[in-house]
Amino acid sequence: MSSPRDRVNAFYKDNLQFKNTRVVLNKEQLLIERPYMLLAVLFVMFLSLVGLLAIAGIRLHRAAVNTAEINSGLTTSIDITKSIEYQVKDVLTPLFKIIGDEVGLRTPQRFTDLTKFISDKIKFLNPDKEYDFRDINWCISPPERIKINYDQYCAHTAAEELITMLVNSSLAGTSVLPTSLVNLGRSCTGSTTTKGQFSNMSLALSGIYSGRGYNISSMITITEKGMYGSTYLVGKHNQGARRPSTAWQRDYRVFEVGIIRELGLGTPVFHMTNYLELPRQPELEICMLALGEFKLAALCLADNSVALHYGGLRDDHKIRFVKLGVWPSPADSDTLATLSAVDPTLDGLYITTHRGIIAAGKAVWVVPVTRTDDQRKMGQCRREACREKPPPFCNSTDWEPLEAGRIPAYGILTIRLGLADKLKLTIISEFGPLITHDSGMDLYTPLDGNEYWLTIPPLQNSALGTVNTLVLEPSLKISPNILTLPIRSGGGDCYTPTYLSDLADDDVKLSSNLVILPSRNLQYVSATYDTSRVEHAIVYYIYSAGRLSSYYYPVKLPIKGDPVSLQIGCFPWGLKLWCHHFCSVIDSGTRKQVTHTGAVGIEITCNSR
């Protein structure tokens, strides 16, 4: 039997004993197992952190995208709101205010002043006080053997003086600058940049007709020293007709004149101040315009070719003469003009679209004429010009005098605009550089001297335009300036236009008239209807004498088709060159004739190196 001590020891043998017991730890095993556990815990924490960061990044990205979309929408809304506010506040409101002031305040006041001025001047016939008659001396002491209608003459004189005063005050606020101040790149030694600004803002009558959908055609617009003048045919249809079968259209010949103004829009605006609208008649088919001295003058005929004889025109040929002041006055007229005795050598004149000038109380135009002595004086010149590689005009059938073998000369048409002058049209003529087509002749006044610039437009894909000089006093002389070729064997002064090679640019469908800019150095502009681009365009070319290259700027058109006519007019305004165009096109889709008009401001800047 075991002893009690053995039983106690047996009870505690398999139990932990803390007293007097030594525990031996396996340190190597602990050192190996503990890092694995820590790494496992850290890896789990790292994965959790990465997951949280990924979730946070996705949410932040979504929030940023939503915020960007909201900001973009707000920015667009703000821009649209600002644009509308600008249009209403800075453009439309001042424009309507200006129009309202002009129509409601200034124009009636000017007419009131005009009426009062005329009444005061007429009272001199029975004066009740002292008058200063120095400005109308003819009303007091007319020259001998001159019979005038005192009432009419003095009223018209007073009206013209007031018109001059009103126009000068109106033009005083405009920003017309000489072209010499317009940067046309003359001082650039490197490359240049050409920029354009399009504008169709207008206070002209033609703009109102276009807005109403009336058909405008045969439009000619010319500018001169802050004024503009134009003429065109307009077809007015009955807009109140309920059925097309009951609609009708009436055609009118319209003449309008006005001033070019700055209305706070940054662009020049044609502001019509006077107009005349006449029912379309045979003698109003073809018209020539002249502008100057605050007047517009026009000569109109039924046909572009008129046979002449020593006594003047035949009875069936009528010349319609129209004169309009920049402001309406009793001196405005619409009447028939008579042709004074004609030089016996003249037998025909040919009229197209011609630009004339008004200077020294006379309106002057230049047109082609035929003379009976053409073969004797210019026959050798023509034969030599057509001998080797004859240009197209040698066998041309497109123009009546060339088809008949005639050699046209230059005819100067002059009509005096004085109130005491009879409306008689005089013609003098002289030969000069050969005239090879009937695209028109335009006359421009130089800044100094007594020479005039005479331009002949280019002939599309055939001949370049020419710039000649014309001297009226002491004797008529037409001399070549640029773009002509001398014929050495032609004898004397024999020149022809510069004809192009057969490799012409087929993308150029039509050329415009040549416009001389008012500068001391010869500068001129022409335009072409170009189809080389996806959108058809009018391409303006700016030339300066002495430069081998030109500047150009294309104006995209909203229409496409076959061009019928292209007429331009250019003038300096501010630091830009503004050109107005009227283009007629046979639409390629509808095959109907459509028109496009507008103005573009061209600015040429030098690129810094």
From Swiss-Prot:
Glycosylation sites: N168, N200, N215, N395
Entry membrane topology: Single-pass type II membrane protein
Residue intervals annotated with topology Intravirion: 1-34
GO MF terms held by the record: host cell surface receptor binding
Xref: Pfam families: HN (PF00423)
Ranges in the topological domain labelled Virion surface: 59-609
Cellular location(s): Virion membrane; Host membrane
Superkingdom of the organism of origin: Viruses
Keywords: Glycoprotein, Hemagglutinin, Host membrane, Host-virus interaction, Membrane, Signal-anchor, Transmembrane, Transmembrane helix, Viral attachment to host cell, Viral envelope protein, Virion, Virus entry into host cell
Family the entry assigns: Belongs to the paramyxoviruses hemagglutinin-neuraminidase family. Non-sialidase subfamily.
Transmembrane annotation, as ranges: 35-58
Function of the molecule: Attaches the virus to cell receptors and thereby initiating infection. Binding of H protein to the receptor induces a conformational change that allows the F protein to trigger virion/cell membranes fusion. Down-regulates human MCP/CD46 cell surface expression.
GO biological process: symbiont entry into host cell; virion attachment to host cell
InterPro entries given in the database record: Hemagglutn/HN (IPR000665), Sialidase_sf (IPR036278)
Protein name: Hemagglutinin glycoprotein
Record-level GO cellular component terms: host cell membrane; membrane; viral envelope; virion membrane
Taxonomic source organism: Rinderpest virus (strain L) (RDV)
